Amino acid sequence: MSSAHNTLESIKYRRGVLQLLDQRRLPLETVYCDITSIDDICCAIKEMRVRGAPAIAVSAALALAVVAERELKEQRQNSVWKTADDMRQFLLMSCDKMMSARPTAVNLSKVLIQLKKDIETDKANTMEAVLETCVQLAEKIYAADVSFNERIMRHGAAHLLKLASKERVNILTICNTGALATSRYGTALGIVRQLFYEGHLQHLYACETRPWNQGARLTVYECVQENIPCTLICDSAVSAVMKTHDIDAVVVGADRICKNGDTANKIGTYNLAVAAAYHKVPFFVAAPSTTLDPLTPDGEGVVIEEREAAEITHIASGGGGLQSDKSNSDYGRKRVVADGPHLKVWNPVFDITPASLITGGIITENGVFPPATAGPLFDISRIVEP
């Protein structure tokens, strides 16, 4: 895969330096945030400056390496850290802190748990050696996600073309699953990219994805940057577009895929899957193996993050529709919903799509896994070991 196809960088990293594209400001502004502390990365994740399950995990790993290098210099100057174990303790505590930043996406916890295990079992006996281990582990995670993207793109594009039995296909998606959500090309949107690069994409239909409008702000932004043919639709138009347009497949990303195939993804994905089943449009989930969670039996065991009411009740005057009271004070906010003592707002960030509605299959870097014709539809433990 040639990097010439893709100029977007949500993550800018070189040893000792990490910058994350502030995705709250897109598409109106392109601003990168410097990550120099564990508090910085936790804030960036919680406030959705960085978002997308793979990007969150990669950013956390790289942040740990960058912060460790900065802390080592400072602590040595102050004579606080004296042994390799002092540094290990800092790294382990930092992993625990980052793990709580967003609960639903499994990639973050899986990456940090693995980092903790590797750091704890590492035999390095100097602080410098512990740092080198941390940096190498983080950079390996970064490189692996790029490779996962490339393989998901190829597997998904080839399978969709074979399934559709036509030269050019129409795809429907939700949220943003492209370069802005991963380390490079994307998962579901990466497949769309591959189809486009090969001349096999007729058109992409992108849901706006309320309330943060990741489809309108981010997916459309990526498509415009690369001249990918795209039509933006309201979330409530998915049934209409499937009825009136020749949609060949729905392809979405995932924040967690349970052992039985139940999938947590951006709110509205469940609606999309129901509509796809009714209109007999194949529904696919595209995600790296780091998103697979064989330890959670089904969707009932997934903690669904809920965010503040202001994301629905307020609009921002200059931030492309960003509504968070806490994270967008610099944009200015205006309430557009009547208020009253009996009004309640429910704002779940994710929903669970039952495995029975994933009619096309699950696409990972290891291939395409269609639902079984007998027995359980999916058994994620057969795709990836826990």
UniProtKB/Swiss-Prot annotation:
One of its GO terms (cellular component) is nucleus. Its main location: cytoplasm. Catalyzes the interconversion of methylthioribose-1-phosphate (MTR-1-P) into methylthioribulose-1-phosphate (MTRu-1-P). It catalyses: 5-(methylsulfanyl)-alpha-D-ribose 1-phosphate = 5-(methylsulfanyl)-D-ribulose 1-phosphate. It is an enzyme of class 5 (isomerase). It holds the Pfam family IF-2B. This is Methylthioribose-1-phosphate isomerase. Keywords: Amino-acid biosynthesis, Cytoplasm, Isomerase, Methionine biosynthesis, Nucleus. GO terms for biological process: L-methionine salvage from methylthioadenosine. The keyword Isomerase applies. Belongs to the eIF-2B alpha/beta/delta subunits family. MtnA subfamily. Its EC number is 5.3.1.23. GO terms for molecular function: S-methyl-5-thioribose-1-phosphate isomerase activity. The active site is at residue 255.
